[in-house]
Amino acid sequence: MINEKKDLEDIIGLSLDKLYEKDIYLIKAGENIKKLVNADVLHNSERSIVHRFAYYFEELYKEKYKDHNLNIDVEYNRNLYDIKRLGEDCIIPDFIFHERGKNKNNILVIEFKTWWNSEQAEDKEKIKKLCEEKEYQYQYGASIIFGKSREEVDIKWYPFDE
């Protein structure tokens, strides 16, 4: 089973490579639209980009590891049989790699931002809490900003250097 940071870094890197190779339109469509119409930049949703990243992550994970008891979920708000919460607030992480219905295999939580909306303070706080809270204890947390190109992608791992 995958549980080493290096393995996660490799799969994340390869997933980003595939995303930028096959789905660059999702990331750069706003720029193209701005050239065609006289309007503010109209970008695709972060969710659509994260969905494709998750698709590639799962594909690569299943290819490399034969134990398929872990799940990749996008915008997942469940905690066992309840809603995922931090204090009183309902939370919905962008991407989690875990075993559904259990909290013992919470491997990775990622929050994403896009180059046109890159404010990360709230996301970093959410990751910190999901990694530290006894109820969740994700082994790893990361914040990823999708850049205009693959080379511009910014990945920060928890604990964050401030």
Q: Which positions does each model-derived feature cover?
A:
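Charged, often low-complexity linker/regulatory segments
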Residues: 1-57
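Catalytic phosphate/metal-binding cores of nucleic-acid and nucleotide-processing enzymes, i.e., regions
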Residues: 55, 63, 90
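Domain-level recognition of nuclease-like catalytic cores that cleave nucleotide substrates
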Residues: 132-133, 140-162
